[in-house]
Amino acid sequence: TPLTTERCVVKTHQVGIKIERWKKIALESSKQCGRIQVPLVAEGIETLKIFCRNSDDRDLKLVFWEMEGDNSLKDLKLDRTPRSVAVLIGPEGGFSLAEIEKTREYGFQTVSLGPRILRAETAPIVALALLQSLWGDL
């Protein structure tokens, strides 16, 4: 789901083109790996607050944040394997501290992808690969 954030640099006139591209990538990638359920790419742009509200029913809510130095996926203490996970990955400039605090109010946990700051295009791939290696298809 594309989000409007304080540091987002995507031009609004490009959003439709990007969403169509992401949908095509999701479909082609699913076919390639034999995945039956194609990941959903939302049509419109949501605010962070709306995304957080819409994630209430998820078993686990994560924000991958470059400033989180101590907490990684392997450090999470879970009672059971999650069946559904809401994932937030920041824009090119990262999330602001105020945005991180807002996500925490909605029950999101901050986790690190490691010591390197990843490109906005790369971070989702790394995050999803790590989640899948821990818990399989979600």
Residue ranges of model-derived segments:
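Structured adenosyl-cofactor binding patch, chiefly the S-adenosyl-L-methionine
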Residues: 97-138
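Short glycine/serine/threonine-biased micro-segments
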Residues: 32, 88-92, 110-112
